[in-house]
Regions:
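Repeated loop/turn-to-beta-strand initiation elements of outer-membrane beta-barrel proteins
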Residues: 33, 71-77, 114-117, 165-168, ...
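Outer membrane beta-barrel
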Residues: 66-168, 173, 200, 367
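Residues that define the transmembrane beta-barrel architecture of outer-membrane proteins
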Residues: 51-59, 99-104, 150-154, 190-194, ...
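Detector for outer-membrane/organellar transmembrane beta-barrel domains
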Residues: 244-335
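Residues on the lipid-exposed face of transmembrane beta-strands in outer-membrane beta-barrel proteins
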Residues: 61-67, 105-110, 156-160, 196-200, ...
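Outer-membrane beta-barrel "beta-signal"
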Residues: 356, 364, 380-396
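Transmembrane beta-strand segments of Gram-negative outer membrane beta-barrel proteins
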Residues: 23-48, 75-79, 166
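Transmembrane beta-strands of outer-membrane beta-barrel pores
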Residues: 41-47, 65-67, 81-87, 112-114, ...
């Protein structure tokens, strides 16, 4: 609550202090506040020998504001909460229940035509891939989630936009000790994370190079037994690259290399490499059939590219608008492996009005296997096994 009032004050203060000492204040420089948000509810069932029913809800109230005290520069802000709860039950028992209230976004931004600086709890993502993203460093978005909600990170992000369409990013993060993205190990407390990114035009597209440094705390790990580890900090360097081009069809490449400081006591992989190759195209059939294809490789071990363990995933997504408000889509993930090929299949229908959206999702997947990215997401897997889910979302 103290952070909320501090944020509002920091946002209002520049506008107030910049006003002339007169009784009349120009209306264009007055802060403008808007309250909106999203309310969602869902229910579903996972078919099994004993079916498991699920129900849940989420409320994301959001306060936004903007002010233009100096004529050219803009101050704006956003603060929101994530209020959510869910239940899972079978015929004769309560399988699970969760409930939580936490900050979702709390940030303030200063921006001009070429520069912006944003501070606070914010969403940070970049890259070209659509379904399986090697550059998912700071978020946890799941392509199967119709709402596309994800936790943010606390930090400072600056971006400068050059005249030739190049963009320079720089960031400093702090207070994000829990594992995020693909991380197996959380970040050491009171240790800042630093990084940057350059995006450059490249013919009919663009390319990007990204770097991130942090000090990981091996005691804060998703692996059981890590709390017994003695060291509290290990250096980690991360490099990323991506490019996308429109040459009639959309083409992209995205990859990431992560090197964690080696230690004899460490039982975790110290090298991780990921690669995504993808394409998309809209076929002129009926209202337009959109098709997306991706190849994704995930590998972790003591060396890059060889040894250790890994997975190859073939992903496809087809989408077709039945009308102005109805859409159907199919997603398929294939994981080839010796002796067994795993398939994950999702069929969804959506209807979108001005403020209300309805989603109906059917899925057939292994009950005990998840994609590499999905396996790292904390919480239950609501799309495991066979089942169906209905979701309503209202935006106001």
């Amino acid at each position: 609550m103290h952070a909320f009032f501090l944020l509002v004050f920091l946002w209002i203060a520049p506008g107030v202090l910049a006003q002339p000492a007169t009784d009349t204040v120009a209306s264009s420089s007055l802060p403008a506040l808007h309250f909106n948000g999203q309310l969602a509810a869902w229910s579903g069932v996972q078919a099994a020998a004993v079916p498991v029913w699920m129900a849940g809800g989420r409320f994301v109230p959001t306060l936004t504001g903007s002010s233009k005290p100096g004529g050219r520069a803009v101050w704006d802000m956003e603060t929101s909460l994530n209020i959510n709860g869910s239940l899972g039950w079978s015929r004769d028992s309560l399988a699970s229940y969760t409930g939580r209230i936490k900050p979702y976004r709390i940030w303030i931004r200063y921006s001009t035509s070429r520069f912006e600086l944003r501070a606070g709890l914010q969403k940070m993502n970049f890259g070209a891939a659509k379904m399986l993203r090697p550059l998912m460093w700071f978020d946890g978005m799941d392509i199967r989630d119709p709402l596309q909600l994800t936790d943010g990170v606390y930090g400072l992000l600056s971006r400068y936009y050059f005249a030739g369409n190049a963009t320079l990013w720089a960031w400093a993060l702090a207070g994000n000790h829990r594992p995020k993205g693909y991380e197996w190990v959380g970040t050491a407390r009171l240790k800042p994370e630093l990084g940057g990114r350059v995006q450059l035009p490249a013919g009919p597209g663009e390319v990007g190079i990204s770097y991130h440094y942090r000090e990981a705390d091996p005691r804060n790990s998703l692996i059981a037994g890590a709390a017994q580890y003695t060291r509290s900090s290990l250096a980690e360097n991360r490099m990323g690259f991506d490019g996308k081009w429109d040459v009639g069809v959309g083409l992209w490449v995205e990859g990431s290399l992560t090197a964690l400081e080696k230690d004899r006591q460490l039982l975790l992989p110290t090298r991780t490499d990921m690669l995504n190759l993808g394409m998309d195209y809209t076929f002129p059939l009926g209202n337009g059939l959109g098709l997306t294809l991706e190849y994704f490789r995930y590998h972790a071990g003591d060396r890059f590219f060889t040894g250790g363990a890994g997975a190859n995933v073939l992903a496809s997504m087809a989408s077709y608008p039945l009308s102005l408000i109805d859409n159907v889509s199919v997603m398929t993930f294939c994981i080839p492996s010796p002796g067994r090929t795993l398939w994950m299949n999702y069929l969804s229908w959506s209807r979108t009005y001005d403020q209300l959206s309805v989603y109906l999702i059917g899925f057939i997947s292994p009950e005990d296997i998840a994609l590499p990215v999905m396996a790292l997401q904390r919480g239950s897997n609501g799309f495991a096994g066979k089942g169906i889910q209905l979701m309503l979302s209202y935006n106001f």
